[in-house]
């Protein structure tokens, strides 16, 4: 059996053999849409599928090697594999050290928090000074009577 008879992907002058798809399962029938149902059309169709799968696989390998998830010796930009790289270490490797700015922000936040606490205390003391005025039964009756008179007036106007 030739090498091209097995599932494979070409990658920079090397042939990467792929695992065959379920050889021991029941026989499957495949339908190829073409005007002629000869073997050459089926071969062309399978070659097109092989090329699509191969290009997708090579793209995934290139992305993984660029972010250091797998080492690819054929790629010059490939990093050493490090699964535990976080986004912070990936982007900070060529970036600026922000620790001094973080210290300044921390002191600003502490000052802001103390100011907010003092404002909350001032608001609380003002709330305690305000005494609610109690309503008497007479005021409630007067309010009820005025609402009823307004309703009666509206009924007379509207009809």
Curated annotation (Swiss-Prot):
Pfam families, alphabetized: Cauli_AT (PF03233)
Record-stated family: Belongs to the caulimoviridae ORF II family.
Known role: This protein is involved in virus transmission.
Name this polypeptide is given: Aphid transmission protein
Lineage, highest ranks first: Viruses, Riboviria, Pararnavirae, Artverviricota, Revtraviricetes
């Amino acid at each position: 059996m030739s090498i091209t008879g097995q599932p494979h992907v070409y990658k920079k002058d090397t042939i990467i053999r792929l695992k065959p798809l379920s050889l021991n399962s029941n026989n499957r029938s495949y339908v190829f849409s073409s005007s002629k149902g000869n073997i050459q059309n089926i071969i062309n169709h399978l070659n097109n599928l092989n090329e699509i799968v191969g290009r997708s696989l090579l793209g995934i390998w290139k992305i993984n090697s660029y972010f250091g998830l797998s080492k690819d010796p054929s790629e010059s930009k490939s990093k050493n594999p490090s699964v535990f790289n976080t986004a912070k270490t990936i982007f900070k490797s060529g970036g600026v050290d922000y620790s001094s700015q973080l210290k300044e922000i921390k002191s600003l936040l502490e000052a802001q928090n103390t100011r907010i606490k003092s404002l909350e205390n001032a608001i609380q003391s003002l709330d305690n000074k305000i005494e609610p005025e109690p309503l008497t039964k007479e005021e409630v009756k007067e309010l009820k009577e005025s609402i009823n008179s307004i309703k009666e007036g509206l009924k007379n106007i509207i009809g």
